[in-house]
Amino acid sequence: MERIEQVVHDCDAPHASARVARDTAARYLSAMKVKDADILIVPGYTNSGPEHWQTRWQSKLSTARRVEQAEWSKPVREDWTTSVANAVNEAERPVVIVAHSLGVAAAVQAIPQFRKPVAGAFFVAPPDVANPEIRPRHLMTFGPYAREPLPFPSIVIASRNDPFCAFEVAEDIAAAWGSLFIDAGETGHLNEEAGFGPWPEGSMTFAKFLTDLKA
């Protein structure tokens, strides 16, 4: 099935609109194919459920695996970053990180511990861990974010009505990291509760992102 696993299995949507996304994405021929990378799925606070887009992608991408955390509901920064770093350092191929929410914070804070190459990172809905109003409050222990370019290509996708991060804050974070910033419109936290099980636009964007990475 290659071709970015048939563009994340026909853009991960059973509806006609997904056919359009698939046809657009399928035009891209990959410089980096799924088989060339270890794709690390890094969920956020409380993990990603069975219908979450991360879980769906994991089931459809042959080299994808989840970074598991010992405690999903009471995250400890050191534990989470160590889990991410261990997954990167145990990889046999260049790594592509696919992180959502607090998983973005964990991945970014783990960078100093990386000993293996990371080809790129696909970051969705990063939380504002510097905001004292964030709940639960212990999520602030994952901040502050480094304000310097990341050592690998990255995309940040953010919503205009994310309850965990103001749009302008996400845009500023992406600029500091040197990330390509994508405005997802009013899409909540881009999670299961916001309707993002099937996510054809995300699948298409991820497929294009992989084509732009070096194998």
Model segments located where?
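Gly/Ala-rich beta-loop-alpha elbow adjacent to hydrolase catalytic centers
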Residues: 98-103, 107
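Acidic catalytic loop of the alpha/beta-hydrolase fold
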Residues: 161-165
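Catalytic histidine neighborhood in serine/cysteine hydrolases
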Residues: 176-191
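Short beta-strand/loop motif that positions the catalytic acidic residue
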Residues: 156-158
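Active-site nucleophile loop of the alpha/beta-hydrolase fold
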Residues: 69-70, 122-130
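Conserved hydrolase catalytic core segment
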Residues: 109-119
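Active-site catalytic motif of lipid deacylating hydrolases and related acyltransferases
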Residues: 33-93
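Post-His helix in hydrolase/transferase enzymes
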Residues: 193-205
